[in-house]
Amino acid sequence: MEPGNYTVVTEFILLGLTDDITVSVILFVMFLIVYSVTLMGNLNIIVLIRTSPQLHTPMYLFLSHLAFLDIGYSSSVTPIMLRGFLRKGTFIPVAGCVAQLCIVVAFGTSESFLLASMAYDRYVAICSPLLYSTQMSSTVCILLVGTSYLGGWVNAWIFTGCSLNLSFCGPNKINHFFCDYSPLLKLSCSHDFSFEVIPAISSGSIIVVTVFIIALSYVYILVSILKMRSTEGRQKAFSTCTSHLTAVTLFFGTITFIYVMPQSSYSTDQNKVVSVFYTVVIPMLNPLIYSFRNKEVKEAMKKLIAKTHWWS
């Protein structure tokens, strides 16, 4: 492209989910409620785990960090999406767009590593219960949590580095409700295929590794459960894994669709729907999944409510 034949883009316009005013109002109210439930649910999980001695175990340490990541994940996307419902087109500078992408990828990738760590925790608890206190010591737990965050930011910097090297010299309207990498790539006038391949390889590798760890952990867990003679023991083991398996299926099913499958295999509208699910809906569902199906969490909640009521 000849110099001077294009205008350098300095800001983008997020088109959002819909142009219809009535639909926008309905979606604004709906997602405001979803975001409020997300914040309250995840904050409640964090406070509950921090204030309940019976929940001071590795599993609930991971769960508290999962709640923190869900708050960050949702908060990096939902507020700007809500603003988009109130005004036609949301303006965002290029630097702000790249920053949002970086934060979204960091929180999302950290969550995948954390879910793998939680699967390993369940494997040790069920398959080697006598060694649990040594194999899941505080040092090991801190290392697993720290590695999850580190892995998230490394992947985020890969996406950030590629996006900073993209050139934007034409349309600046992003047909999305946040700055995701795929819509940015479609607007770019750069023709370097590596900018599409490198993030896909990075995300794909992380998904393969984390899913492999989760799958291998649950294969061993299943074998151990089938060897149990006690029906009550089997039910208890299954119940501790059901919530995590549900969260894993929802999370990895959606991010695989977006970050691994070729862009030509899905439309922009499909991208939007799936993106809403994994950035807005799943962070709301996780605390509900872990609360309703977990006796220890429900008991800790009852004690906290009773204590609060007594002090009042």
From Swiss-Prot:
Topology with respect to the bilayer: Multi-pass membrane protein
Cysteines engaged in disulfide bonds, as pairs: 97-189
Domain of life: Eukaryota
Glycosylation: residue positions: 5, 165
Alphabetic keyword roster: Cell membrane, Disulfide bond, G-protein coupled receptor, Glycoprotein, Membrane, Olfaction, Receptor, Sensory transduction, Transducer, Transmembrane, Transmembrane helix
Cell location: Cell membrane
GO CC terms, sorted: membrane; plasma membrane
GO biological process terms held by the UniProt record: G protein-coupled receptor signaling pathway; sensory perception of smell
Major localisation: membrane
TM regions (residue ranges): 26-46, 55-75, 100-120, 134-154, 197-217, 238-258, 272-292
Pfam families: 7tm_4
InterPro entries given in the database record: GPCR_Rhodpsn (IPR000276), GPCR_Rhodpsn_7TM (IPR017452), Olfact_rcpt (IPR000725)
Cytoplasmic-side segments: 47-54, 121-133, 218-237, 293-312
Extracellular-facing ranges: 1-25, 76-99, 155-196, 259-271
MF annotations from Gene Ontology: G protein-coupled receptor activity; olfactory receptor activity
UniProt xrefs under PANTHER family: OLFACTORY RECEPTOR
Function: Probable odorant receptor, which recognizes only aliphatic alcohols, suggesting that it may convey a 'woody' or 'sweet' sour.
Entry's family note: Belongs to the G-protein coupled receptor 1 family.
Protein known as: Olfactory receptor 5p57
Native source species: Mus musculus (Mouse)
Taxonomic lineage: Eukaryota, Metazoa, Chordata, Craniata, Vertebrata
